[in-house]
């Protein structure tokens, strides 16, 4: 399980497992204020095929192909597309893409801080928030990519929760 903006951190986690069909690949995107609000960065839900940085991929864009402005409370996830590898994983259904809104991610960031002493980057908090969406079998081994440093997001946490 890893968060996906452009997808570099998730690519590092997934790469060696992609040919192993026993491994479920879960990509967690930022739904921002909600998929239908116009303030989201959920490329799998809102994107279509396009070109960015010379690569054909899934991209949030207007009808005439102009890139639209994504939104996420997490600066690391507000990217208007996903890397070509993730676009392939989405199209081929090799990865499951889930969109998590700001509120759920922030709640999980606070929960991890209070219960585990881990201050996750807000990007990582999005990945952990899927625990509200699904349960895993106790016999499964589940990897969460805990990337980034939450201390860089302390001001955002403090402002958001009015701490």
PLM regions: where:
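Short, flexible coil/turn micro-motifs enriched in small/turn-prone residues
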Residues: 1-2, 7, 60, 71, ...
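Catalytic phosphate/nucleotide-handling subdomain of diverse soluble enzymes
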Residues: 22-28, 33, 132-163
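Buried hydrophobic positions in well-ordered alpha/beta secondary-structure cores of metabolic enzymes
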Residues: 1-2, 7, 25, 77, ...
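Short, well-ordered alpha-helical packing segments
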Residues: 1, 11-18, 25, 158
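Active-site/ligand-binding loops adjacent to catalytic centers
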Residues: 19-22, 27-118, 159-163
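C-terminal structured "cap/appendage" subdomains that terminate the fold
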Residues: 112-145
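Short glycine/serine/threonine-rich phosphate/pyrophosphate-binding segments
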Residues: 3-14, 35-36, 124-131, 151-154
């Amino acid at each position: 399980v890893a968060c996906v903006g452009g997808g570099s951190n998730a690519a590092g986690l997934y790469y060696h497992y992609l040919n192993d069909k026993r491994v479920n690949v879960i990509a967690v995107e930022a739904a921002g204020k909600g998929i239908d609000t116009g303030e989201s960065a959920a490329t799998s839900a809102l994107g279509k095929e396009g070109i960015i940085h010379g690569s054909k991929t899934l991209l949030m864009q207007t009808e005439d192909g102009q890139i639209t402005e994504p939104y996420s409370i997490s600066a690391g996830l507000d990217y208007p597309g996903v890397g070509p590898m993730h676009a392939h994983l989405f199209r081929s259904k090799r990865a499951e893409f889930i969109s998590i809104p700001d509120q759920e991610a922030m709640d999980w960031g606070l929960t991890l801080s209070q219960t585990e002493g881990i201050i996750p980057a807000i990007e990582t908090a999005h990945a952990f928030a899927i625990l509200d969406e699904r349960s895993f079998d106790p016999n499964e081994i589940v990897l969460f990519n805990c990337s980034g440093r939450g201390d860089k997001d302390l001001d955002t946490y403090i402002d958001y929760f009015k701490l």
